[in-house]
Amino acid sequence: MLKVKIVRLNKQASLPVYATAHAAGMDISACIEAPITIQPSTTALIPSGFALELPEGYEAQLRPRSGLALRSMISLPNTPATIDADYRGEVKVILINYGKEPFLVSHGDRIAQMVVAKVEAVRFEEVEELGSTVRGEGGFGHTGTGRQ
């Protein structure tokens, strides 16, 4: 199991936790002094109260929680949000309210999930042309949307 250093920046902060034994993502909770209301079609930056030291070659991805998206139309506009291995600041979550009603975030609310993933650095090799494939340049629904 990968060990990641974490600092609680606020004594009231909840550290990330897996909700089930086989969950891919850890729940991230809001660490705020007063409730924050996110009006429809607006965003809010929500602090978590902790900072990470990810090992080189890893990133943390912040993703929406499916229940918030389904029930309240709350998501992350930049999903997945990336936390780089060399970032040492507080983890904060940008939430957006796609719904029609204001949404209240309170201290301790689980607002996102975090997945730690290995990343590979790449070096590009510029060439005159790319190898061919059956797919070619087809994209953006070129295979259709109905049953096959």
From Swiss-Prot:
<feature type="binding site">
    <location>
        <position position="92"/>
    </location>
    <ligand>
        <name>substrate</name>
    </ligand>
</feature>
<keyword id="KW-0546">Nucleotide metabolism</keyword>
<comment type="similarity">
    <text>Belongs to the dUTPase family.</text>
</comment>
<dbReference type="GO" id="GO:0004170">
    <property type="term" value="F:dUTP diphosphatase activity"/>
</dbReference>
<protein>
    <recommendedName>
        <fullName>Deoxyuridine 5'-triphosphate nucleotidohydrolase</fullName>
        <ecNumber>3.6.1.23</ecNumber>
    </recommendedName>
</protein>
<feature type="binding site">
    <location>
        <begin position="82"/>
        <end position="84"/>
    </location>
    <ligand>
        <name>substrate</name>
    </ligand>
</feature>
<dbReference type="Pfam" id="PF00692">
    <property type="entry name" value="dUTPase"/>
</dbReference>
<comment type="function">
    <text>This enzyme is involved in nucleotide metabolism: it produces dUMP, the immediate precursor of thymidine nucleotides and it decreases the intracellular concentration of dUTP so that uracil cannot be incorporated into DNA.</text>
</comment>
<dbReference type="GO" id="GO:0046081">
    <property type="term" value="P:dUTP catabolic process"/>
</dbReference>
<keyword id="KW-0460">Magnesium</keyword>
<dbReference type="GO" id="GO:0000287">
    <property type="term" value="F:magnesium ion binding"/>
</dbReference>
<dbReference type="InterPro" id="IPR036157">
    <property type="entry name" value="dUTPase-like_sf"/>
</dbReference>
<dbReference type="GO" id="GO:0006226">
    <property type="term" value="P:dUMP biosynthetic process"/>
</dbReference>
<feature type="binding site">
    <location>
        <begin position="65"/>
        <end position="67"/>
    </location>
    <ligand>
        <name>substrate</name>
    </ligand>
</feature>
<keyword id="KW-0378">Hydrolase</keyword>
<dbReference type="InterPro" id="IPR033704">
    <property type="entry name" value="dUTPase_trimeric"/>
</dbReference>
<dbReference type="InterPro" id="IPR008181">
    <property type="entry name" value="dUTPase"/>
</dbReference>
<comment type="pathway">
    <text>Pyrimidine metabolism; dUMP biosynthesis; dUMP from dCTP (dUTP route): step 2/2.</text>
</comment>
<dbReference type="InterPro" id="IPR029054">
    <property type="entry name" value="dUTPase-like"/>
</dbReference>
<feature type="binding site">
    <location>
        <position position="78"/>
    </location>
    <ligand>
        <name>substrate</name>
    </ligand>
</feature>
<keyword id="KW-0479">Metal-binding</keyword>
